[in-house]
Amino acid sequence: AFYNSNAGKQLVWIGTSFVLIVCILVIDFRFFESFALFIYLGLLLLLIAVPFLGVTINGSHSWFKFGSVTIQPAEFAKTATALLLGKYLNDPLVNLTKFPFQWKAALIIAIPMLLIIGSNETGSALVFASFMILLYREGLPGAYPALFIGGIILFVSALLVKAWIILLV
């Protein structure tokens, strides 16, 4: 059957993506703004359900299988997080130079990120780090991205350096 071949599956997903793109373009943006919180919470529920109802594919227990179709909620969680973060930052009262607003923005990003890391899907979780650029552009003090980048450098260095060298230092 055509669908069982790799090319067939790709064509089905290209067609599905095209339909989804048209739907997104036709729907008024206020719909997404109005339902951003519900979309986000729904995806959080899916991320919570993955360890219990999901299947393991390529060593990652972060997939749902429906017949021959598999989906990864982490991919949709990125979009849901972007929607809710955009809605939050659109509020004229939000000031990212003040700690309470920084804390709320960090929680919006951190909750799905931690759930995804718990599903052994570190690559998808790292994509959430790119939200730091958005927050910096929207007024987050520069010390936060600097500390974040420093932490990443320290983490990667710790992976590359032998443990006994770290103990000597």
Task: Give the positions of each predicted feature.
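Hydrophobic alpha-helical transmembrane segments of multi-pass inner membrane proteins, especially
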Residues: 2-169
